[in-house]
A protein has these predicted regions:
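Switch/communication elements of ASCE P-loop NTPase nucleotide-binding domains
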Residues: 1-47, 174-297, 317
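The start of beta-strands in P-loop NTPase/AAA+ ATPase cores
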Residues: 17, 127, 208-209, 306, ...
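Conserved P-loop NTP-binding catalytic core
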Residues: 39-86
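ABC ATPase nucleotide-binding domain signature region
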Residues: 56-69, 115-138
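Short glycine-/polar-rich loops that comprise or flank the Walker A/P-loop
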Residues: 60-65, 87-89, 122-128, 239, ...
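Extended helical coiled-coil dimerization/tether regions that scaffold
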Residues: 104-106, 123-212, 373
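RecA-like P-loop NTPase motor core
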Residues: 257-366
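Activity-critical C-terminal alpha-helical subdomain
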Residues: 364, 369-434
Length: 448
């Protein structure tokens, strides 16, 4: 039994949103933009937490949560078949002003009021583990007991593997565990669960939903990447993992359907942004994945307030350096090296899909020493970049003919393009270097 969608209305900082769920969900976005709100809404809907007055965004309006479940095991289907319609089970919680909470289930096309007890009985088919950023002793004990109860229900409680988990859990429950050790023990526990699940070719915690807030805390980058891989493997084998994170090590462009960006607006509060369509086709998939493996740091684009797309290393180094020199550099803007001009449209597709503000910087490449065929080919690539841009949140700047000519304010010979990043940085870092007016204007536009 898997949660597939949840409509959220009038909850905390959310006026209305409806995320669609993958087995692995990655909730990202700036602090105070709604990540905790969407997670708390899911937890309340699943019966894991109580309703508090402050959870209702506007007390004069109804609160409503409506979720749909799919993919039932044989045992689940047998117990819930009376409630399943067209392979889906749909539940609703409503709270009208001055009235008690109502629980409803959709039977065929009609809504039927049910008791809270019946509601919770239905949801008991989805075990839950919750890991907040920090836990006290009582919460740690509850987490450990919940984990072993899940394993017991799945007849894994007497397994040899469970003994090693118990050793880790005993250390976790120690009175003198530091926050750093606590987080590292959680890392070891989930790595063990993932490894054992892979051996058995199914999740040993079944369809459990794991809520894990900020799993990156107190972990070094290599451990973050390994834990993220453990999450991927577990989700592929049947577990449901809902992660909120500020670390690009828990984001992969390959799993873009798992990404849910929370954004906050003055007019209508926080909203979830996802893209469930197909971004690339044919050779685009191969080239994009190859490009990603060359530089996996590109995942940071999902955390940026604005993304600056550039062709190569020279542009990335020089633009950042000159922006600092001009006093306009912004740390919440990410300069993304795409690798080549032909790859830029693919990144634009990705940014368009998630409505992330961006500006694409590319070389016109119409140098006087180029052949007509080279210039025609270059212009085709330039036009493909321009056509890909959604000007609601994207733009472009064209260098004439490349950043080197902009830096030196002169036409460049073909022979002058060896060791470009080194010589470009050497030039702009000289004390008497004056940024040409045309280049300064372009950098100011990039960082506006």
């Amino acid at each position: 039994m898997y949660l597939k969608s949840l409509k959220v209305e009038n909850w905390q900082c959310i006026e209305y949103t409806k995320p669609i769920f993958e087995n692995l969900m990655l909730f990202i976005g700036p602090t105070n933009n709604g990540k905790s709100s969407i997670i708390s809404a899911i937890m309340f809907f699943l019966g894991y937490r109580n309703l508090r007055t402050k959870d209702i965004r506007n007390l004069d309006l109804p609160l409503e949560l409506e979720g749909t479940f799919q993919n039932f095991s044989q045992a689940n289907y047998k117990n819930l078949k009376d409630f399943i319609y067209k392979k889906e089970l749909t539940l609703k919680i409503q709270k009208f002003p001055n009235y008690d909470v109502q629980y409803k289930i959709k039977i065929n096309r009609d809504w039927k009021i049910i008791t809270e007890e019946t509601y919770r009985e239905i949801l008991s088919h989805i075990p839950i583990l919750y890991i907040p950023p920090f836990q006290d002793k009582k919460q740690i004990n509850f987490l450990v007991n919940s984990l072993f109860e899940i394993l017991k229900r799945r007849n894994i409680s007497e397994d040899l593997m469970v003994n090693s988990l118990k050793e880790l859990a005993n250390t976790l429950q120690n009175d003198y565990v530091s926050k750093g050790l606590y987080r590292n023990l959680l890392f070891e526990i989930f790595r063990s669960i993932s490894e054992e699940s892979q051996k058995r070719n199914h999740s040993i915690i079944g369809n459990t939903i794991v809520f894990f807030e900020e799993p990156e805390l107190y972990l070094h980058p290599q451990a973050e990447k390994e834990l993220y891989n453990a999450f991927i493997q577990l989700s592929n084998l049947g577990a449901q993992l809902y992660i909120s994170t500020h670390s690009s090590n828990f984001i992969s462009l390959k799993h873009y359907k798992s990404i849910c960006i929370m954004r906050k607006y003055k007019e209508f509060g926080s909203k979830a942004f996802q893209f469930k369509g197909k971004l690339f086709s044919g050779d685009e998939v191969k080239y994009f994945n190859m490009n990603y493996w060359i530089n996996p740091d590109r995942s940071e684009l999902f955390f940026a307030k604005k993304v600056i797309l550039v062709e190569g290393q020279t542009d990335k180094i020089v633009l950042g350096y000159l922006a600092k020199k001009l006093g306009i550099y912004k740390y919440n803007y990410s300069i993304l090296e795409c690798g080549s001009k032909s790859i830029i449209p693919q990144f634009i597709k990705l940014l368009n899909a998630f409505k992330i503000p961006y500006i694409a910087i590319y070389d016109k490449d119409n140098h006087y020493w180029r052949t007509d065929i080279e210039i025609e080919n270059s212009n085709d690539k330039n036009h493909s970049i321009q056509r890909a841009i959604n000007f609601k949140f994207g733009d472009f700047i064209e260098f004439e003919n490349d950043i080197e000519e902009e830096l030196y304010n002169e036409k460049r010979e073909r022979k002058n393009y060896k060791n470009k990043p080194f010589y470009a940085l050497k030039t702009v870092s000289e004390e008497d270097y004056i940024i040409p007016a045309r280049l300064k204007e372009k950098i100011e536009k990039i960082y506006k």
